[in-house]
């Protein structure tokens, strides 16, 4: 069902590529906020400890939709009813311009956003609000547990997100940068990387992960060549000289 919903929305997006609507491909997975509470009650656990990374804030994703960033927010993502009303209002305008989004996935999309951004998160603590997120320390910890890594990238960040390689290809092709640029920029601000180091990293990380993209599109039963050609033909935010 989730893959069906993603496919419906991806087909809608490909009909009229819009950087502000890429986020809709990830809306359905936000139901994990609901399932976590269910598991917590079933196992009688008193609190949730999360590992969200404060360096991964990416205002540009909603910004492409026209949603102004809140640089003073103290979470990785926006919460609250008023913010969601504004955000979903902008989405609704985009949907009216492309009615293909008005499909069977709509309720799943809206309810997922509710559980993530509107419903109050009780007994919720983020580990990296109290302990600095350091990439070397994180990678060493993962290696100590023999944690599986991706075959097509050295970075361990975002490798668990099946959509990441696809949407970063879209952002890089249509806008000229990806979430790796914002991630590494935040590390520079925190003094974790020099600008020179960051530029070397993003030069590698922004290369298309075709193997992962093909896996993603195969899972959705969509034609890889046709999808890539559609993205490559889409209007760009920059000019190539």
Model-derived segments and their meaning:
Residues 1-241:
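Nucleotide-activated chemistry modules centered on ATP-dependent adenylation/adenylyltransferase
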């Amino acid at each position: 069902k989730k893959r069906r919903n993603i496919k419906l929305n991806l087909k809608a997006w490909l009909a009229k590529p819009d950087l502000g609507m890429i986020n809709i491909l990830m809306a359905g997975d936000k139901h994990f906020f609901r399932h976590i509470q269910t598991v917590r009650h079933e196992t009688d656990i008193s609190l949730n400890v999360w590992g969200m990374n404060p360096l991964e804030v990416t205002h540009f994703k909603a910004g492409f939709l026209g949603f102004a960033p809140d640089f003073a927010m103290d979470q990785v993502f926006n919460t609250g009813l008023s913010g969601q009303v504004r955000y979903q209002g902008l989405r609704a305008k985009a949907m009216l311009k492309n009615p293909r989004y008005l499909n069977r996935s709509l309720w799943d999309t809206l309810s997922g956003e509710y559980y993530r951004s509107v419903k109050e998160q009780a007994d919720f603590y983020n580990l990296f609000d109290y302990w600095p997120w350091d990439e070397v320390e994180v990678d060493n910890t993962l290696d100590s547990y023999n944690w599986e890594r991706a075959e097509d990238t050295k970075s361990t960040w975002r490798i668990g997100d099946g959509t990441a390689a696809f949407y970063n290809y879209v952002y890089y092709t249509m806008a000229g940068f990806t979430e790796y640029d914002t991630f590494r920029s935040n590390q520079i601000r925190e003094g974790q990387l020099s600008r020179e180091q960051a530029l070397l990293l993003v030069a590698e990380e922004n290369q298309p992960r075709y193997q992962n993209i093909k896996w993603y599109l195969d899972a959705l039963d969509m034609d890889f060549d046709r999808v890539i050609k559609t993205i490559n033909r889409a209007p760009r935010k920059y000019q190539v000289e």
